[in-house]
Structures are given as structure tokens and as C-alpha cells.
Amino acid sequence: MSFSEMNRRTLAFRGGGLVTASGGGSTNNNAGGEASAWPPQPQPRQPPPPAPPALQPPNGRGADEEVELEGLEPQDLEASAGPAAGAAEEAKELLLPQDAGGPTSLGGGAGGPLLAERNRRTLAFRGGGGGGLGNNGSSRGRPETSVWPLRHFNGRGPATVDLELDALEGKELMQDGASLSDSTEDEEEGASLGDGSGAEGGSCSSSRRSGGDGGDEVEGSGVGAGEGETVQHFPLARPKSLMQKLQCSFQTSWLKDFPWLRYSKDTGLMSCGWCQKTPADGGSVDLPPVGHDELSRGTRNYKKTLLLRHHVSTEHKLHEANAQESEIPSEEGYCDFNSRPNENSYCYQLLRQLNEQRKKGILCDVSIVVSGKIFKAHKNILVAGSRFFKTLYCFSNKESPNQNNTTHLDIAAVQGFSVILDFLYSGNLVLTSQNAIEVMTVASYLQMSEVVQTCRNFIKDALNISIKSEAPESVVVDYNNRKPVNRDGLSSSRDQKIASFWATRNLTNLASNVKIENDGCNVDEGQIENYQMNDSSWVQDGSPEMAENESEGQTKVFIWNNMGSQGIQETGKTRRKNQTTKRFIYNIPPNNETNLEDCSVMQPPVAYPEENTLLIKEEPDLDGALLSGPDGDRNVNANLLAEAGTSQDGGDAGTSHDFKYGLMPGPSNDFKYGLIPGTSNDFKYGLIPGASNDFKYGLLPESWPKQETWENGESSLIMNKLKCPHCSYVAKYRRTLKRHLLIHTGVRSFSCDICGKLFTRREHVKRHSLVHKKDKKYKCMVCKKIFMLAASVGIRHGSRRYGVCVDCADKSQPGGQEGVDQGQDTEFPRDEEYEENEVGEADEELVDDGEDQNDPSRWDESGEVCMSLDD
């Protein structure tokens, strides 16, 4: 194969479009020289597209220039080849041998043809426009044409190519091997003829990159030189770094905007991680992958629009709720009144540092004195947590620059204030059975409504616990862990709140088959019947009597048992083997009388000193119940135990410290009072008011007469089951007793919605709310003046319900003054007195209610010895 044939094939493959060296069968060769391209090859080729109406020559010039080229002689072409090759050598570093001279024509020197052929190939690869050498039939003896200038890619300059590449990076998107363009016009498929020759038409171009000096884009491949053969062309390769940038059509900021978005770098596809659930995550296999194909189409702006549309869809929000619920960890070790704070938070660290400063006395600017004990603290912490301290330190004594750094509080609950102070510095409120009342009292005094409400919920849960017939036989309340334990030892669910610190007395489990003979009263009890006196008296486990012998390391529990069978007794005995349990026993005080005619056997329990209390130990047998007194002569008729166990031998009195209350024997040789079993199936034991001044209530069987006439002529059978543990007030209804207890606790649980002032009664809040209203509804009945406050209307030493103002009360005018102006009273000197008398008035009203409840004329005379417990 000659060098000229190699040159032709190389030029045809590179697409340079050079004028060949020898004439032949070219369409533009009139001399009939050799064709510029190699002969047709047997490889498959694409069918040639229809020729355009006016096909431009390879170099993009017109018909005049083509005629001019045809008129050139071969000598002219050879003469022009030398300088062109030299210029190209200076512009590009050619791979020439070291012993070779400068580039010459085909006939210059021994190595001239080889160097010229290599020069032609290099120029054809670099610029695509080198002139042909040798005998060209189309030249007609004219000089050889000059080599084309250096062209980049499709004939454009370096600056143009750089600008186009920079613009192409932001517009064209390569994905899955295809080009995604922002252009709204339809791109023509195939190759287009650029500004180069027809053989160069294989370069890919979009509608914005149509090359040439006004050249038209044509589908298919260009027509090469020769006998109309089509030449297979290849698109020009782009830099690898540019292709990587074009393929990256995903924005990393989308992952922050849409947390549900999942992106695959391998496939370039996006999907929703919440809507598309795999079978491992609990999703269905039949469900199509939602959002896998829909979110991967279009341009970048269109994709983000699809993401936003999917984000606000209803179906996605449903999956979003389920995904968020699954991410929330389950809470273990739930506690109602004490939650563990986040130790890594700034707030926790700040409070801990302030608490350490308080304990060490650093920068403490106030001393709080409570019952002689001094507490160091910071004013800013106290003001931030208590409305009382805020009023004390911020709104009072503004005229004195040097305020007193010592504050005395008129409260006696030292332990309660210590808990409140720890709460202000830690955020944790520690409530136990011993300090709940004190903490609530101190919080009410300091006007901390949230703490008061928490204490109320704590106490309310305790009051709601009662021993009923359907209740379990044994309940253990562990105050250290504050978790209930059933009889089988299993802990109940966390939502069950056990916070009881009131001991509910229970009359239960008298001895089975007990034969009692005393003064003609013979009763044979055939079966065990439980009588329950619910909430008859409350005993606080934190009282001094209860706390005398309690050690700090012991677990305090209350146990209510039903000892009806031997099997239950054995189970309870096994469970309580290693426990220190508290037992509550009703007290029967002594009396000097020597007979049982009155049958007054007991009165409401009173906390007796431990040294005067006879204690009973629990034994597994229930055959008999006998209690020996100090003189040892007699046996008590029956004993009443809240957690009743009896002595097996029936004669030993226990000396253990497990029992705080016991049966008190009389000083005489005879035991005058005891429990007498009844004969009725409905009520075994009932309370009846006694005739003696010492004992008002006693137990007697139902078979006795239901009405008795005593010395004072009163007759009734009533059981006053609700008695105040702090005073002698006895209520008939539970709600009345709760209102009465507010007098002793001093809890101000009702607050004004406008100013936040606390009150003990709801009616006091309603009356106080009139102060904030513009309506003046308080009018003096004498002078007809209208006042803003109810405290301004009232007699000085009487109740303000009479509606007489202070001035009229001082003047003691019986008549009225009709013509006095109905002006607003701007001064209210009795406001402080009104606030001070609020609690006193509540006391008067509650005492009146108590007197009405104890009125014998209003007692229930239905004939029942024991009233219903569910009033």
C-alpha cells in the first residue's frame, strides 16, 4: 500500500476533508485522477440521507473558491505545502526524528516523502485542513493550497470552546448515557454538518450549537469525497471531568430539605424512604415503589417541583406520621412525679452549677429563716420560681436601697421548704408520703400554683384508693419505689398510680367459730363475714407516733389482708417473711364502769402513746382471739384488727414494735368493752351512740333493739364514719369532709384567672372576680353608695352580708340617705382585713355545715344500724 493510499484513508478516517494528492474518480476532478477516498469497503454502512439542496464544500467556502482551487497547478500546491508545514511545525510539536531536517515538500531530500506524509497526518489530526501533496488531478498544475489554520473540535477557537463548555455545564445534563438539555426545542437526532467539511459532520450538536457560518443542520452523516460513498463518523469525545459534572443532576441540598428522600448514586434515581416500604420494614410486596420513577424525570427545576408536590401530598403525610412514631423510642422506667433530665443540656448544667454555689454559699445574697433554720439562696432563683418572692423582692421596699438580706417565713414546715428549695435549683420535685402535706402547704404559701397542683394530684390518687369487697386480698405499696405489688409478687402496669399515704381502717376477719359467753350474750358465728368501714379515720404515716420506731433503711409498706382461708394465710406469711410491716389496730379505751349494759365497745381511734399500747403479734391460726390485760384475770370478748392475726394459743400479748395501736384493757378486773358479733347476715357489727360521756360510739349486734332511749331523750342509730383526723368534726358526706380539711391544710388550690391570686374555696374566687369587672354591684343598704369591692360593704364586727358600709356602721344611722351621690369609692381601707378574714370566714361556714350535719334531727332514722358506704 502506497503512502498516498495511507494518506487518503487516514484523512478520510480523521474527517479532515483534505484535497487529495492524485486525481481519479472524484466528482470535483476533471482530470480523472484517483479518487480521494479509498474504495468502497464491505463493512455495513448507514443508508445515505437525501442530499441537501445546496451542499457546502468541505472547507465551508462557496462555489467561487472551489473553482479557484481547481485552477491551481500541482506545482503551486507543492510550493505552498512547504511553508504551511513549517508554520504548523512551529505551532505544534511534531514527532520528527532528531536527524531530520525541517519539513519539506514530497520531493525534498531522501526522507522527504516520509516526513511529508507524517506532516500531512499530523496536520490532518490537529487542524483537519492540511493541503494535499503530489499529483492531484483537480489541481490542474496549480500550486498546492495552504494548510488550514489550527481549529479546535468543530473549527472554533479556544475562547469560543471554553465559553461553550462553561455554559454547557449548567445547561446540559447527562444521565444514563443520554444528554438532558434545558432547551425547550426538539433536538435533531443524529449528526449535523458543522462548519468543517462533509466528512466532519459526525459531531453531535444541539439546537444551540449548530456550527458553521450559516450552515444548516442535516440529519444523518455527511457525504464524503469520492463517488458518493458515505463515511462512518464518530462523535467527538468530551473531557471525562466534564461528563462527570453533566451526569450529576442531583442537588445535595435536597436531602436537607426533604428528610424522606433517598438517592442512589449508581442509578441516579430518587425515591421516598417513608412511602416506599420494603417487606423487611413491614411494607407490602404488592405495593408499587411510590416515587421511584416519578421523581427522576425532567430537568432539575422540574424534579424539585415533583419533590415538593410529593412532600405535601396526603398519602405522604400519613406515612410521615407512621415513620415519626416508629422513630420515637419507648419510655422505660416511667415515673409520674420525677422525670430524669437531660444531663447534656445547657439548662441542666446551669442549674447544677447554681445548686453547687448555693450549697457552698457562693454569691448567696439572701438568707431564708424557717423555724430557726437558715437556708442560703440566690434572689434571682427565688424570684423566678415563686410569685411570693417576686412580690417581696421586686415590688416592695423600693425606696430603701439597702434591702434586708434576711427573710423570715411564717411557716413551720422546714422539710417542706427544703424540698421546694431543691426543686427551684434542680427542677425535680420529690414527693413522698411523709412530706406531701408540708410541701403543698409551703407551695401554697409561696404561691407556686404548679407545685400545689402536683401535690393535689398526689394526694387525690391516695384518697381514691379504698379497700372494697372486690379489691385484692393483699396489696403492698412500696414507698421507696412507688410501685404497687400484687399478691403474687408481680408489678402492675406503669399507668396505675399508687401514691397512698393514708391508712384506711378495715374491720375484717374476726375469728371463725368463736364462742363468746358474757352476761347472757351467747352468739355462735358460723362463717366469716367482712365488714368494711371505709375511710372511717385517716392516719398519716408521717405522724410522730408512726415515725418513732421507723428506721431509715427499712421499707415502709401497708398491707391489707383477707385472712379467710389457711392457704391465703400461708402465702401471705411466706411473702412477708423478710418485711417490716405496719399493722393498724383499733383502740378501745378503758372505763370505770363494771357492766356491759350499755354495750359501748369503742370510740373513734386515737393515737395512744406506744408505752400505753398493748401490742398483738400475727399468728397463722384463727381459732380464737384472746387478749390478756395487765392484771391477767380476764379475756377480752373479741379483738378488732385492721390486719387481723390472732394468737394461736390465745393468751399471749405481743411486745413487737410492728404494731402501733392495740386494744386497751380497763384498769379494773373486768374488761367492759369488746366486739360482740351479730346474728344478721347483712350486718355483723354496727355502731351505736353511747349514753356515757366517755364513749359515744360502740359496736353491738343487729339483733339488739334498733332504737334506744337514753337519759337525754335522744334516739337515733347512726354511724358517723367520716371524722376529721385533726379535730372532733364529723362529716356525713365525703365532699363535706374534703372541704373541711382545707381549714387544716391551708391549701389555696383555686386561683383567679386574671391576677393569679389563690383562694381556698371556689366561691371565694367568684366573689373576687367581681373586683376586676367594671360593674359596681355592691351597694350600701343605708346610704345607697355603690362600691367596687365587697370588703367595703359590711359591718365592722359582723358579717358583710348585711350590706352596710363602714361609714354608716360607724354613724349607726337606722334610716337611709336617699340623696347621696352614687360615686365610686376610691379608697378601700378594709381590703387587708377582708383578705385576712377569708380563711376565718371559710372556717365559720364549714363549722356551720358541721353543726348541721351533727344535728340529731337530721340524722338518718331508716332503722339500719350501719349506713351505706357509698354516700
UniProtKB/Swiss-Prot annotation:
Residues 364-433 form the BTB domain. Gene3D superfamilies: Classic Zinc Finger (3.30.160.60), Potassium Channel Kv1.1, Chain A (3.30.710.10). CDD domains: BTB_POZ_ZBTB10. It comes from the Eukaryota. There is a cross-link at residues 245, 468, 483, 497, 573, 672, 684, 696, 706 (Glycyl lysine isopeptide (Lys-Gly) (interchain with G-Cter in SUMO2)). Residues 65-76, 830-854 have a biased composition (Acidic residues). GO terms for cellular component: chromosome, telomeric region; nucleoplasm; nucleus. The modification Phosphoserine is found at residues 210, 565. Residues 27-37, 77-103 have a biased composition (Low complexity). GO terms for molecular function: DNA-binding transcription repressor activity, RNA polymerase II-specific; RNA polymerase II transcription regulatory region sequence-specific DNA binding; telomeric DNA binding; zinc ion binding. Keywords: DNA-binding, Isopeptide bond, Metal-binding, Methylation, Nucleus, Phosphoprotein, Repeat, Transcription, Transcription regulation, Ubl conjugation, Zinc, Zinc-finger. A zinc finger (C2H2-type) spans 722-744, 750-772. Residues 39-56 have a biased composition (Pro residues). GO terms for biological process: negative regulation of transcription by RNA polymerase II; regulation of transcription by RNA polymerase II. Its main location: nucleus. Residues 14-26, 126-135 have a biased composition (Gly residues). It is found in: Nucleus. Residues 1-156, 177-228, 812-871 are annotated as: Disordered. InterPro entries: BTB/POZ_dom, SKP1/BTB/POZ_sf, Znf_C2H2_sf, Znf_C2H2_type, ZnFinger_BTB_dom_contain. SMART domains: BTB, ZnF_C2H2. May be involved in transcriptional regulation. This is Zinc finger and BTB domain-containing protein 10. The lineage of its organism: Eukaryota, Metazoa, Chordata, Craniata, Vertebrata. The gene is ZBTB10.
